[in-house]
């Protein structure tokens, strides 16, 4: 990524740099997220529906990258989602806890540990929403 005339451009392996806005809103969101992570070292970052604009087959790669970067920068991520596809890729995070808001549950919040989440991921018919 390079700053050219006050705009970010990205090297995509071709002979020219493309302005970042040519790459779509999903990529732009990820670039901003990485910038926010760089500025949030030793802190927390709240991310709403990270999966929006990202091709679902790339969720696992994205999660592994964010997990690695979050450890490197010591940033704790809190991510909201309504996407089963995204949840099914959460095993890429080395440390993981999932919270589900449910007014019928005592206290209104259900907490799932890694074991419970992996059981959910294995049940292809499950829907957490």
Language model segments and positions:
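C-terminal lobe/lid and adjacent interdomain/linker elements of RecA-like ASCE P-loop ATPase modules
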Residues: 60, 64-129
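A generic structural-conservation signal
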Residues: 1-2, 79
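Conserved ABC ATPase signature
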Residues: 4-39, 44-57
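Structural signal for conserved beta-strand scaffold positions within catalytic alpha/beta enzyme cores
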Residues: 2-3, 100
């Amino acid at each position: 990524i390079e700053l050219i005339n006050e705009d970010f451009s990205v090297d995509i392996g071709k002979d020219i740099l493309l302005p970042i806005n040519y790459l779509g809103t999903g990529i732009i969101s990820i670039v901003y997220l990485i910038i926010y992570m760089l500025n949030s070292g030793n802190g927390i970052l709240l991310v709403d529906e990270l999966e929006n604009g990202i091709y679902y087959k790339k969720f696992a790669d994205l999660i592994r990258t964010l997990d690695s970067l979050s450890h490197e920068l010591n940033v704790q991520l809190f991510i909201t989602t309504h996407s089963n596809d995204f949840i099914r890729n959460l095993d890429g995070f080395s440390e993981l806890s999932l919270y589900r808001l449910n007014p019928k549950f005592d206290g209104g919040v259900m907490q799932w540990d890694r074991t419970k989440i992996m059981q959910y991921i294995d049940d292809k018919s499950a829907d957490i929403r």
